Amino acid sequence: MDTKQAVLDILNELTGEDLSDQMDENIFENGLLDSMATVQMLLELQDKCDVTAPVSEFHREDWDTPNKIIAKVESLRNE
């Protein structure tokens, strides 16, 4: 599964929303993810995308849209 689809699947599971046509939607400002769901998202990304995304290094502004999450996961894969 590619990164984009994995991220969208995780977000859909956590938010109940299909964000595939809202790739620049701010998921925090719009109340789609809270702090508990954010931790769950990071755990799911680690599991499904084989990346390490520690909560301690999480900066909301770097992860606030589906596009940014995809870019961050791809960046972590290349480290």
UniProtKB/Swiss-Prot annotation:
Cysteine pairs forming cystine bridges in this chain are: none
The entry's cellular-component GO terms read: cytoplasm
A Pfam family (short name) is PP-binding
Q: What is its main location?
A: cytoplasm
Keyword vocabulary terms for this entry? Cell wall biogenesis/degradation, Cytoplasm, Phosphopantetheine, Phosphoprotein
PTM note says: 4'-phosphopantetheine is transferred from CoA to a specific serine of apo-DCP.
Q: Which residues carry this modification: O-(pantetheine 4'-phosphoryl)serine?
A: S35
Entry-linked PROSITE patterns: CARRIER
Provide the family line: Belongs to the DltC family.
- What molecular function does GO assign, one term? D-alanyl carrier activity
Report the locations given in the UniProt record. Answer: Cytoplasm
This chain's function reads: Carrier protein involved in the D-alanylation of lipoteichoic acid (LTA). The loading of thioester-linked D-alanine onto DltC is catalyzed by D-alanine--D-alanyl carrier protein ligase DltA. The DltC-carried D-alanyl group is further transferred to cell membrane phosphatidylglycerol (PG) by forming an ester bond, probably catalyzed by DltD. D-alanylation of LTA plays an important role in modulating the properties of the cell wall in Gram-positive bacteria, influencing the net charge of the cell wall.
Q: Which InterPro entries match?
A: ACP-like_sf, DltC, PP-bd_ACP
Q: Has UniProt tagged this entry with the keyword Coiled coil?
A: no
The Carrier domain, residue ranges: 1-77
Protein name stated in the entry: D-alanyl carrier protein
Q: Which Gene Ontology BP annotations are present?
A: cell wall organization; lipoteichoic acid biosynthetic process
User: Which pathway does the protein contribute to?
Assistant: Cell wall biogenesis; lipoteichoic acid biosynthesis
Q: Which HAMAP family match?
A: DltC
